[in-house]
């Protein structure tokens, strides 16, 4: 059996790692998550699958996959992309989230590549008619993502509406808003438990800044909201508009300051949620041809 190391920094939320382990493991391949290891002996592995990041030096002579699940963020994001393009070592295979990500990195070589968009775990495909909260937000809670705009709205204008916040907020954010009775912070929740909690809300908030690179990338949480059949309130940006059109879904759009977020308008809005079972992880991974790509890498290296 060949051992494949799924190597990440441990900082990012990467549901795709569990999907790879669940759907790509077989009698020939064992996938190991680096986040579950204390120390790593790279010599134990037959293939290194890296979630990028930077990778300037090749330290072991085994095949390497570079996965670019997102573009660089923060200050000088495009410059960071350029540095990665120029200085990252050349892998045997690259995986890109979508065409937008591939185009922005603009690697000028003939390394094989595949696209692997985000999928949704089976556990999110539930419908819960017992609603205990008005709104839910799942995901990153940072100043950079502008999450305080949402919290300010519910602390003041929407203080009669309950808001369930699933995830780990930055300490200063939690310290400021924990006193508001209508804002409920769950803290970090096990991934498989999220749908049971989140589905108790009537509306789900997808709050993505309309700025590079966030507006080009797939919103994992929005996909999970759709799978749970929640009524979705979202900011207006490139990717979400393309997805809405492609799937024939209808979301309630808000601006960054949430001025359009009014309960009376939501009650009158004709939400349209459709089936996205074609975006289950097993279906997404079938489309990528990843299994055959891995087989070919291993075959070339070890036969």
Task: Please place each PLM-identified region on the residue numbering.
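N-terminal pre-catalytic "stem/leader" segment of glycosyltransferase-like enzymes
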Residues: 1-52, 251, 299-303
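A charged, aromatic-enriched C-terminal amphipathic alpha-helix characteristic of glycosyltransferases
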Residues: 15, 123, 253-303
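Membrane-proximal helix-turn-helix segments that form the acceptor-binding/catalytic region
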Residues: 75-96
């Amino acid at each position: 059996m060949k051992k494949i190391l799924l190597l990440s920094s441990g900082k990012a939320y990467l549901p795709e790692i569990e999907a790879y382990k669940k759907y790509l493991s077989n009698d020939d391949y064992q996938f190991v998550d680096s986040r579950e290891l204390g120390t790593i002996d790279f010599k134990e592995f037959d293939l290194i699958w890296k979630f990028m990041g930077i990778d300037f030096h090749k330290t072991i002579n085994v095949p390497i996959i570079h996965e670019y699940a997102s573009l660089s963020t923060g200050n000088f994001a495009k410059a960071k992309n350029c540095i990665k393009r120029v200085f990252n070592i050349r892998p045997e295979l690259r995986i890109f989230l979508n065409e937008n990500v591939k185009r922005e990195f603009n690697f000028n070589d003939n390394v094989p590549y595949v696209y692997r968009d985000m999928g949704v775990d089976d556990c999110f495909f539930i419908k819960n008619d017992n609603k205990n909260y008005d709104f839910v937000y799942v995901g990153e809670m940072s100043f950079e993502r502008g999450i305080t705009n949402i919290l300010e709205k519910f602390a003041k204008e929407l203080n009669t509406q309950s808001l369930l916040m699933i995830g780990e907020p930055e300490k200063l954010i939690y310290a400021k808003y924990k006193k508001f009775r209508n804002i409920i912070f769950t803290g970090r929740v096990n991934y498989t438990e999220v749908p049971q909690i989140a589905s108790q809300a009537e509306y789900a908030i997808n709050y993505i800044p309309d700025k590079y690179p966030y507006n080009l990338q797939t919103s994992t949480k929005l996909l999970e909201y759709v799978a749970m059949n929640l009524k979705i309130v979202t900011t207006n940006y490139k990717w979400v508009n393309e997805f809405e059109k492609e799937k024939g879904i209808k979301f309630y759009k808000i601006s960054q300051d949430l001025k359009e977020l009014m309960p009376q308008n939501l009650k009158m809005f004709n939400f349209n949620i459709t089936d996205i079972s074609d975006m289950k992880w097993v279906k997404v991974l079938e489309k990528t041809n990843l299994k055959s790509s891995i087989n070919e890498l291993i075959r070339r290296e070890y036969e």
